[in-house]
């Protein structure tokens, strides 16, 4: 968060190069990146569903996180990893792997995380902020989703929903909603967790 302010371009800024990270298709770009949609010169990604929409693509479908790929690129260039860079990469790797619990996590993932930790970052503070602390709105969202969840096939399929009306009622932000899609899969005995979100009236995202 202390470095977030430096990530926003000033009004009227025209970039010489545009790089997308962790984006498999142009329709997944956030709204503030849409002006650059047709001019992305490099896409760095780890999704096998990559649509190769950029001029060049750096793809490693075996990587658990794009942070791993960026780390490898930095090392290949012979550049140093500062504590600030290490912090950003650790956040990228830990969030993409669900704090190293998703099945895509590999031994290499842990080795890279260890090297980033050696750069002097406060891993405890990062993990607490990302994985052990939730806003009151986020907890209220989870409570309503659990209360309204639907079970199918003897509990093997769990369906949860995030209606637009709920987001408006609780004044939820994108930060409150982020990663809620994984909640359905936490129910014991579940083989398939499905989350339906209504981002706009008449539109449902699965």
Regions picked out by a protein language model, each given a short descriptive name:
Residues 23-26, 47-49, 164-165, 199:
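Short glycine-rich anion-binding loops that position phosphate/pyrophosphate groups of nucleotides
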């Amino acid at each position: 968060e202390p470095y977030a302010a430096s990530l926003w371009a000033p009004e009227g800024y025209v970039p010489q190069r545009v790089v997308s990270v962790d984006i498999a298709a142009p329709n997944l770009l956030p709204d503030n990146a849409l002006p650059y949609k047709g001019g992305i010169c490099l896409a760095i990604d780890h999704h096998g569903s990559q649509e190769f929409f950029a001029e060049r693509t750096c793809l490693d479908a075996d990587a658990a996180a794009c942070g791993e790929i960026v780390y490898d690129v930095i090392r290949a260039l012979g550049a140093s990893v500062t504590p600030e860079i290490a912090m950003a990469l650790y956040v990228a790797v830990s969030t993409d792997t669900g704090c190293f619990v998703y099945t895509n996590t590999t031994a290499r993932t842990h080795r890279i995380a260890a090297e980033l930790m050696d750069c002097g970052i406060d891993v405890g503070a990062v993990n607490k902020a990302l994985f052990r602390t939730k806003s009151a709105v986020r907890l209220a969202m989870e409570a309503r989703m659990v209360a309204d969840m639907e079970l199918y096939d003897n509990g093997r399929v769990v369906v949860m929903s995030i209606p637009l009306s709920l987001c408006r009622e609780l004044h939820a932000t994108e930060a409150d909603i982020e990663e809620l899609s994984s909640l359905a899969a936490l129910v014991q005995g579940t083989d398939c967790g499905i989350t339906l979100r209504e981002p706009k009236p008449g539109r449902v995202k699965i």
